[in-house]
Amino acid sequence: MHNKLNEIKKNESPPKVIKNLFSKDEINKFLSLYEQLPTTIHNKKQNVIKKRWLKEYGKELEELFYNRLKNEIGEFKYDNLKTESGDIIFGLFQESYNPIGLHIDGGFNFEDLIYKQSLIPLTPVGSTVIFKNRFYGKSTNFTIDKNELEKTKLNYGQNIRSNKHIGMFGNKPFNKEDHQKFLMHEKINDLLGLEIELVYEWELG
């Protein structure tokens, strides 16, 4: 668990959807930045492309992003990953045509003070499911798949695999209607004890 768990809990708040944070022109600039960035991962099997926001690209956009977010959540510091040469990464762009599995973005260092997570959709197609339940470990992909759980030799910046969420939040079966509507890509038994807090249907801006 994180060393600053009490401080993390004090900073917790319900999910908040901020509309019109960025203009249409600014969104187009982010899309242009995405096209310029080199591809980090292209998983053709899962149809996912990931690109790191390297510091050599879009410095003005980074300042814009930081200041807009600071106006909403107050002063903060990025939980930056680094490149192979030790340079910081501003963030991660992800282009996916399939749903992303159950996970948390809890950072990779228990010394860090996790504050807020931000998600900026660059397309109006898609949604994000946020749960009421809280898990205070490092960045983790949750699964009951034995093959996934055996993956322990992970690269820098990859989420660990875990099934520790099973039973952690009780044994109440997951809502079948919610499963069919939002989470058919997950095995319902993998959602044991979980409860949805918000389903955010993406909007530009």
Question: What function would you assign to each model-found segment?
Answer:
Residues 1-89, 97-99, 143-171:
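Non-heme Fe(II)/2-oxoglutarate
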